[in-house]
Amino acid sequence: MAAVTQAEDSSITPELSVDALLKLANVVRFRIYVALRAFGTLRARQLAELTGITETSMNRHLDVMREVGFVVAEQAGKTRQSWLWSAVPGGVRVGRIEGGEIQDAALEWLRAVSGAYGIIASQWPSVAASWPQNWQSAAETSDWVMHLTAQQLDGLAADLRAVATKWKQASKINEPALAEQTVTPEDPDWIAPVVLILTAIPYPSRPR
């Protein structure tokens, strides 16, 4: 299995085990993880609204994710409803894996990642019209079908990561202002979480 990274540039990454991967291999849990990375600190109620599940179910998912070390809770009040949840820095990292139970678990996790990002991407067309025109114009959904060697695909992936890394630096500059911004979405200086999904894979099957 080729190296896969879903991570911030940080050394704070919990150790992955078969058990941890299987517990993270859940579409809802990965959507929770993406939401926390996008918005920072949220309560279970807010996460439940973003993912379309009940707050009770959300708390169960958060408990599992906290058990394997990928979310943390700040107990900001006496009741659980007031707890503030955040994703740990470091992301979820899956390196080069060869065979065995860990590979099977990693594949399950990758399927959950693909499913979660598919849901997020599919939500944009339904809400795009409610966004200001400049954001509608800036949003990008494109696809290409290419014919490449494995070495060329490796080069393409490296180029895409380099471009993403460049803009991640801009994101880090913006992040301190995100929580305190007072401008509205119509203002050109407004900052929003942006999800970039990179998938460059061989077509999964071949005609017989």
Report each predicted region and the residues it spans:
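Short, cationic-aromatic polyanion-contact patches
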Residues: A20-V28, R43, A76-G99
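Residues within the helices of the helix-turn-helix
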Residues: V34, A44-R45
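A short acidic, leucine-rich amphipathic alpha-helix
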Residues: Q46-L50
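Key DNA-contact positions within bacterial/archaeal DNA-binding proteins
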Residues: T56
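Short, hydrophobic-biased segments on the C-terminal half of alpha helices
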Residues: L62-D63
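Beta-hairpin "wing" of winged helix-turn-helix
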Residues: V68-G77
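Amphipathic alpha-helical dimerization/coiled-coil segments
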Residues: S86-M146
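Charged, low-complexity intrinsically disordered regulatory/assembly segments
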Residues: S130-R208
